Swiss-Prot record:
Species for this entry: Nitrosospira multiformis (strain ATCC 25196 / NCIMB 11849 / C 71)
Residue sites binding ADP per the record: G162, A163, S164, R165, T166, G167, K168, T169
Family matches, as PANTHER family: PYRUVATE, PHOSPHATE DIKINASE REGULATORY PROTEIN 1, CHLOROPLASTIC
Protein name: Putative phosphoenolpyruvate synthase regulatory protein
Source organism superkingdom: Bacteria
EC number: 2.7.11.33, 2.7.4.28
Catalytic activities: [pyruvate, water dikinase] + ADP = [pyruvate, water dikinase]-phosphate + AMP + H(+); [pyruvate, water dikinase]-phosphate + phosphate + H(+) = [pyruvate, water dikinase] + diphosphate
Biological role stated in the UniProt entry: Bifunctional serine/threonine kinase and phosphorylase involved in the regulation of the phosphoenolpyruvate synthase (PEPS) by catalyzing its phosphorylation/dephosphorylation.
Record has Cell cycle as a keyword: no
HAMAP family xref list: PSRP
């Protein structure tokens, strides 16, 4: 029998996300890039508010200590505006991916203008109107979660429907937080399946309805975490509810998608696209 070659185990690496403000932007960009290397084990560390030389020097020390511990160069993603702070971070024993300098220079050349070098502009409350739109959208999503409210359903930009525990609530909150979308959600339950018609609260807003479905096996896993050994969580009941919800949505002409293996971000993006909602990040 031939001896099969042993595939070396991937080395565990550390990824740092550095920012002079919240770190949200660099985390999103770094995660998007690293998701292309799913077989590489990673430890992730975010260091926000690196807005002074002293903090930058401390960050370099932390990065170098990790290099010694891992015996592998850390990966450093940064969105640092101050060139002096960037220079300090460049001295670290790491692969430094400076997300700002990569893009700012060609943008300055193309636009014929210097960048402002202001820190944290993308997450600053510079537009009170946009800020309050998000706050009001979040409050609306909470008030209209799981069919709780009995009024103002026609105010929703979109109302998500489907069996319970298919990802409707977190998607609504994400749409509200990121885009200021007024998103409600209404669970389809066995009583609706028996009547074979939509609940009265959402019957007159059919054009704003969008559905989620899910594989019964995955729904069984999710519900079992909350109510193990219950009829509600049983695989048989999950199969019944998923099939019945899909049948009801088809009958009502409601577009729907399979949420089984999609992230909240992917679900929200799909809803924006399919429901033709304005996509504006605040």
């Amino acid at each position: 029998m031939p001896i099969m070659p042993i595939t070396p185990k991937p080395i565990r690496r550390t990824a740092f996300f550095l920012s002079d403000r919240t770190g949200i932007t660099v985390e999103m960009l770094g995660h998007s890039l690293l998701s292309q290397f799913e077989n590489i084990p990673l430890d992730e560390i975010t260091l926000p508010y690196i807005d002074s030389k002293a903090k930058a020097t401390s960050a370099v020390r932390t990065i170098n200590e990790r290099y010694i511990a891992d015996e592998a160069r850390p990966l450093v993603f940064s969105t640092l505006v101050n060139p002096e702070i960037r220079l300090i971070i460049n001295s670290a024993d790491a692969l430094h991916l400076d997300c700002f300098s990569i893009f700012i220079a060609p943008l300055e050349a193309e636009l014929g203008a210097r960048s402002s070098e202001n820190m944290g502009r993308s997450h600053r409350v510079s537009d009170p109107t946009g800020y309050w739109k998000r706050i009001n959208a979040i409050n609306y999503a909470l008030e209209h979660d799981d069919g709780l409210s009995q009024k103002n359903w026609n105010r929703a930009d979109v109302t998500l429907v489907g069996a319970s525990r298919t990802g409707k609530t977190p998607t609504c909150l994400y749409l509200a937080l990121q885009y200021g979308i007024y998103a409600a959600n209404y669970p389809l339950i066995p009583e609706d399946f028996q009547r074979e018609e939509l609940p009265a609260q959402i019957r007159n807003i059919r054009s704003k309805l969008f559905g989620f479905t899910i594989h019964p096996e995955r729904l069984h896993e999710i519900r079992s975490e909350r109510k193990p050994e219950s009829v509600y969580a049983s695989l048989k009941n999950c199969e019944y509810e998923v099939q019945s919800a899909e049948k009801l949505m088809r009958r009502a002409g409601i577009p729907y998608l399979d949420a089984t293996s999609k992230s909240i971000e992917e679900l929200a993006t799909a809803v924006l696209h399919e429901a033709k909602l304005e996509r504006k990040i605040y």
